[in-house]
């Protein structure tokens, strides 16, 4: 069965993407990091679409498959807090006072 971009665009869940590309994955890793994997995957897809606008649909799907593998691999070795993909991990809490701010001059 040949996969198409139209089929790809209908996918919603992380597991659907892995099955579509016939990639092995650990369900525990995906369950814990689902949103982060999909966010990273989305960023990588955007880069592919921007950098390679004229590649064939088949090559685009190949690149997307590599992007999903890459997004998944990131979270095998690091945490969402380390990756800081979402705003909540980027913003410094406003109600925190550092020790250097407490020291007297």
Curated annotation (Swiss-Prot):
It comes from the Bacteria. Coiled coil: none annotated. Signal peptide: none annotated. Pfam families: NifW (PF03206). InterPro entries: NifW (IPR004893). Keywords: Nitrogen fixation. One of its GO terms (biological process) is nitrogen fixation. Belongs to the NifW family. Homotrimer; associates with NifD. May protect the nitrogenase Fe-Mo protein from oxidative damage. This is Nitrogenase-stabilizing/protective protein NifW. It comes from Nostoc sp. (strain PCC 7120 / SAG 25.82 / UTEX 2576).
């Amino acid at each position: 069965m040949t996969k198409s971009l139209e089929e790809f665009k209908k996918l919603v869940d992380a597991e659907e993407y892995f099955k579509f590309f016939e990639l092995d994955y650990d369900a525990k890793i995906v369950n814990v990091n689902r949103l982060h994997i999909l966010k990273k995957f989305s960023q990588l897809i955007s880069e592919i679409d921007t950098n390679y606008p004229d590649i064939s649909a088949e090559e685009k799907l190949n690149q997307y498959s590599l992007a999903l593998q890459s997004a998944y691999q990131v979270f095998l070795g690091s945490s969402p807090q380390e990756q800081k993909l979402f705003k909540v991990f980027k913003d410094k809490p406003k109600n925190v006072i550092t020790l250097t701010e407490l020291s007297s001059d």
